Curated annotation (Swiss-Prot):
Claim: Ribonucleoprotein is one of the keywords in the record: yes
Cofactor note: Binds 1 zinc ion per subunit.
Keyword annotations of the record: Metal-binding, Ribonucleoprotein, Ribosomal protein, RNA-binding, rRNA-binding, Zinc
Name used for this protein in its record: Small ribosomal subunit protein uS14
Xref: PANTHER family: 30S RIBOSOMAL PROTEIN S14, SMALL RIBOSOMAL SUBUNIT PROTEIN US14M
Keyword Zinc annotated: yes
Domain of life: Bacteria
HAMAP family registered for this protein in UniProt: Ribosomal_uS14_2_B
Similarity comment: Belongs to the universal ribosomal protein uS14 family. Zinc-binding uS14 subfamily.
Organism of derivation: Campylobacter curvus (strain 525.92)
Assembly description: Part of the 30S ribosomal subunit. Contacts proteins S3 and S10.
InterPro entries: Ribosomal_uS14, Ribosomal_uS14_bact, Ribosomal_uS14_CS, Ribosomal_uS14_sf
Length: 61
């Protein structure tokens, strides 16, 4: 889990636009966040395996 202070800092508008970054809405992870879902790869995989995201399933070939 991310620190509460870092999550609050990311929520504020940055002084310069290029300094903005995305965080996972569930765990607050700053890296590997999918913009389509708004969550990180770890949470996306967990939710997909539990069937919480409609239309998304684990690939097998």
């Amino acid at each position: 889990m991310a620190k509460k202070s870092m999550i609050a800092k990311a929520a504020r508008a940055p002084k310069f636009k290029v300094r903005g970054y995305t965080r996972c809405q569930i765990c607050g992870r700053p890296h590997s966040v999918y913009k389509d879902f708004g969550i990180c790869r770890v949470c996306l995989r967990k939710m997909a395996n539990e069937g919480l995201i409609p239309g998304l399933k684990k690939a097998s070939w």
